[in-house]
């Protein structure tokens, strides 16, 4: 519903702005530019979708091997001690714990198609434990904020878009996204823990969060000591080595589970092809809307206004061009994806703005969509502190993304 209003607004605002330019500035080219943008944006959307087919097929094939090889179950065992402390109201050994673990593990691995049904199943289990059926319980809120914080280890789709749009190193945003999504997740956990009075100084929580924080601090310190050229070399090398290790690890996991690795890959690759075909109309719709909005001059006015406000505060404004992606992300994943593609198309995939838009896209998730779908599936209408905690995690992710992008690419 939100995306419907946003899409309509793109066209209505574009019409008003274009009409004002025609009447007051005698700009007779604005409407031809708008119409031309609808054709060029449609063509761009189709070309992107076509190019996505091969890489999506590759990675969804690899992911299917990992899924059937028991990688999600491994994540569940590793995270078990931590989540028993973050969800103290769930009885020990309750089956809903497995659904929560599997959903979060699927999200971290980028398995969106697996994550959503697992998440809905987890919500059903949490609702069974919920004494007030119309009100969100503490475990529900913690679970959903962890989802909205966008924690991910493998930002496949973003790297795929970068590759399709001609980035020199599509994986160069891999490490920045890992760092930014860590901060958004940490902020979400801390916010919910304060609301729910969860002891953050518990030994298990301190071990996990403290250890991860030290690791992230060490990574940031290390990259802060390098020259710009060294940062590019180290981050790209690490990203590619890590991704190839994941491929090898998933294949080994499949071998250990004695599955037919090749057949699993082909099965997942077919899903990748179907996914690429399915997104064509959605990508055409959002890119045409954004194209019309930009061709009318409305996008330039919006960015220029924010740019001037930022400069008045004495802050560098290079990041402003990517802000539309950050503002759209809590509302609509496809809308934010379209704005990310638009930023890379307009400024270039290897520009500061293009890279930052990708980091914004990968550092948070669609907060309002997730809350609506997950709470709606079990009939919860009173969300308590879920929205403020989710938005706080989004804000932390956006701020972290900007600072980290300046560190790596500024």
Located regions from the model:
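Membrane-embedded alpha-helical segments and adjacent helix-loop junctions characteristic
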Residues: 29-128, 257-346
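Hydrophobic alpha-helical segments, principally membrane-spanning helices and signal/leader peptides
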Residues: 36-39, 46, 95-97, 132-140, ...
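Hydrophobic alpha-helical context, especially transmembrane and signal-peptide helices
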Residues: 5, 33, 94, 101, ...
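C-terminal transmembrane helix pair
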Residues: 114-115, 122-161, 167-197, 323-410
């Amino acid at each position: 519903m939100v995306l419907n209003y946003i899409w309509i607004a793109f066209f209505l605002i574009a019409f008003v702005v274009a009409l004002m330019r025609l009447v007051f500035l005698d700009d007779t080219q604005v409407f031809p530019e708008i119409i031309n943008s609808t054709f060029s944006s449609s063509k761009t959307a189709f070309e992107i979708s076509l190019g996505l087919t091969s890489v999506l097929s590759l990675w969804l094939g690899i992911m299917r091997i990992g899924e059937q090889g028991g990688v999600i179950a491994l994540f569940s065992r590793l995270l078990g001690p931590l989540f028993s402390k973050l969800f103290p109201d769930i009885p020990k050994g309750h089956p809903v714990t497995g659904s929560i673990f599997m959903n979060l593990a699927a999200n971290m691995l980028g398995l969106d198609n697996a994550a959503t049904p697992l998440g809905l199943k987890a919500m059903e289990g949490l609702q069974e434990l919920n004494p007030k059926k119309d009100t969100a319980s503490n475990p529900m809120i913690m679970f959903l904020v962890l989802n909205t914080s966008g924690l991910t280890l493998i930002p496949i789709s973003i790297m795929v878009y970068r590759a399709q749009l001609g980035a020199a190193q599509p994986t160069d945003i891999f490490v920045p996204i890992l760092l930014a999504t860590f901060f958004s997740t940490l902020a979400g956990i801390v916010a919910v823990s304060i609301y729910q009075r969860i002891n953050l100084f518990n030994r298990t929580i301190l071990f996990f969060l403290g250890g991860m924080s030290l690791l992230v601090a060490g990574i940031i310190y290390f990259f802060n000591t390098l020259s710009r050229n060294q940062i590019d070399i180290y981050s790209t090398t690490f990203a590619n080595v890590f991704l190839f290790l994941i491929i090898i690890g998933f294949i080994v996991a499949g071998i250990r589970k004695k599955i037919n690795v090749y057949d699993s890959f082909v099965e997942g690759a077919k899903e990748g092809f179907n996914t690429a075909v399915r997104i064509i109309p959605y990508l055409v719709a959002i890119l045409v809307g954004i194209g019309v909005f930009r061709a009318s001059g409305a996008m330039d006015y919006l960015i220029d206004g924010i740019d001037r406000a930022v400069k008045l505060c004495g802050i560098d404004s290079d990041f402003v061009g990517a802000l539309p992606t950050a503002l759209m992300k809590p509302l609509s994943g496809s809308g934010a994806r379209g704005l990310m593609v638009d930023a890379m198309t307009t400024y270039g995939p290897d520009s500061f703005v293009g890279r930052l838009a990708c980091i914004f896209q990968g550092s948070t998730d669609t907060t309002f969509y997730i809350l609506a779908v997950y709470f709606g599936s079990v009939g919860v209408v009173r969300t308590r502190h879920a929205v403020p905690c989710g938005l706080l995690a989004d804000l932390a992710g956006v701020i972290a993304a900007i600072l980290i992008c300046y560190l790596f690419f500024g």
